[in-house]
Amino acid sequence: MDSSTSLLPPLGSIILACEGLTSLVPLILSVMVCLIATVTISPTLLAYFNDPFELRAYPGPFLARFTSAWISWIISQNRWSETVDLMHRQHGPIVRLSPDHVSVASPAAFAAVYGHSSGALKAPFYNAFANFKIRSIFNTRDRAEHSRKRRVEAHMFSPRSIRALEDTARVHFQVLVRQWDALCAPTGKTVRGSAEGTLGTISWKVHGDRVWFDCMPWFNFWSFDTISDLAFGRPFGMLEAAKGSAHVSKSNTKSVQAVSQDTSHSNEAQSELLEIPAMEVLSELLDFTVALAYLPAWVQPVFGRLPMFRDGYDAAPKLANLSLTAVANRVASQTDRADMLSELLRGRDEEGKPYGLEELSTEAELLIIAGGDTTANTSCATAYYIARDLQIQAKLQAELDVALDGVESDVAPYDAVKDLPYLDAVINEGLRLHSTIGAGLPRVVPSGGMTVLGQHLKEGTVVSSPIYTLHRNEAVWGKNAYEFYPERWLEASADAKKEMMQSFAPFSVGPRACLGRSLALQQLHILLATIFHRYSLVLENNAPAQLPLRDGFARKPMKCIVGVQRRK
């Protein structure tokens, strides 16, 4: 026998050793589980019993005392705004949402948290929205950085700049009208009023004298095409194709090369394109981001790889690529066309510095998110309410018929409809019940603390005030606060109207209020005036009593089937 071989342990000894280790596996696993539980639970229990922010006295869900996972679960179930509102109705104006977070619901509280005099900064929640290393004007938590960006970008959304883009936006209203006219055409040609088919990805069916289809995708097609044209000089082409897709470069690298203005690479960057379902990508990313945003930072990457979050996790690089491709296309065109990106390219901060590549891209991504989804959501919800109540629709159409009498264009001119009292009331009521974001966005109480509703909140406490609940305060809006009633804006006394306006914040308030307010209001006026002057809309007989929503970050309608007919 070889001497080296004799040094090896006998085979039987090895087998016995392995069997011994195998018998220890349950014990090892038990120890690991205990260690993980200790690491996870101990800080939770310590925070609860130590109560560093002195929030134990405030009511709220039992689990919210121990962990932020409660609110993440509610968000993942698409019940964010409505659940927090229910908590306030049950427990009062101050509700605890997590170990360090309280929600405060009143007009005074909203102003205290978000107003110009508030020293509160955005919470770590916003870190989850960072898809680039450089933050956007929305997700930056640094006050000085936000001020710098606001100075650069404010002119882009000024009323004068928005008016200059009206003719560009009009093109997409015209395409929407043309497509809806095409859908309505079979109603006059069918035998016994029945036919069905598809236009792009949209199924339609004629029943009686109306064509029935889901209008929600159309509002998204319109908003995505509008913002991509206004921002980057060309539409995504969703309206024409009736399809929620966009084309991106097959690699971020090629988009970056084009944006860097190295023209030797620009053709290469445009040659290999990939079609992505942009509307789905945006929805998946927002749902994923908000569901994880309240969890500890170290947990987020782990949860992001779970099967239930996989689509959202994969959506982040796709949306980044979409913004990079949009910027690349615009820069490679070398046009002097006036649009939002040209404003960003010309913009300079107080030191005379322009935006760099990554900063352009992160702001472009924000334009796609804000412009592609938010106005579409409010438009669809408002159309749902109008289609549900034919008396409201008749009043609106009577006002529009007078205002647009003699107007030859298929699209309502903004100047003709911007000051119509009943249209204004309808839009305000739509924004009240379906503001872009219903949940309270979190802020961190600054040094020295903050007093809200007579209660002192310690420095570092996270505080939010929900728009959804603010807009349904019965003390301000009356017993019918949960109902769509445009007349409330016309019937209120001067004092009541003043109180209503103090409790009306669809675009938030203060230094972090939405810069796109003027654009959104212009688009809502033109869209709703154009649609309801040209068409009659009704809901199905078995339509749900409430519009089905994905109530996560944005309150997104899931579906809205309407019966559409051209008006005589």
Swiss-Prot record:
Which gene name does the record give? CYP041
Tell me which InterPro entries the record gives: Cyt_P450, Cyt_P450_CS, Cyt_P450_E_grp-I, Cyt_P450_sf, Cytochrome_P450_monoxygenase
- Name recorded for this polypeptide: Cytochrome P450 monooxygenase 41
Organism lineage reads as: Eukaryota, Fungi, Dikarya, Basidiomycota, Agaricomycotina
Principal location: membrane
Question: Which family does the UniProt entry place this protein in?
Answer: Belongs to the cytochrome P450 family.
Query: Where is this chain glycosylated?
Result: N321, N377
Organism's domain of life? Answer: Eukaryota
Membrane-spanning residues: 21-41
* Entry cofactors: heme
Its biological purpose is as follows: Cytochrome P450 monooxygenase that is able to use 3,5-dimethoxy-trans-stilbene and 3,5,4'-trimethoxy-trans-stilbene as substrates for oxidation.
Which Pfam families did the record assign? p450
Its membrane topology: Single-pass membrane protein
- List locations, semicolon-separated: Membrane
Q: Which UniProt keywords apply?
A: Glycoprotein, Heme, Iron, Membrane, Metal-binding, Monooxygenase, Oxidoreductase, Transmembrane, Transmembrane helix
- Mind telling me which GO cellular component terms the entry cites? membrane
Q: What is its EC number?
A: 1.-.-.-
SUPFAM superfamilies tied to this protein: Cytochrome P450
Q: In which pathway does it act?
A: Secondary metabolite biosynthesis
Q: Name one molecular function that GO assigns to this entry.
A: heme binding
Residues that hold heme according to the record: C514
Among Gene3D superfamilies, the record links this protein to: Cytochrome P450
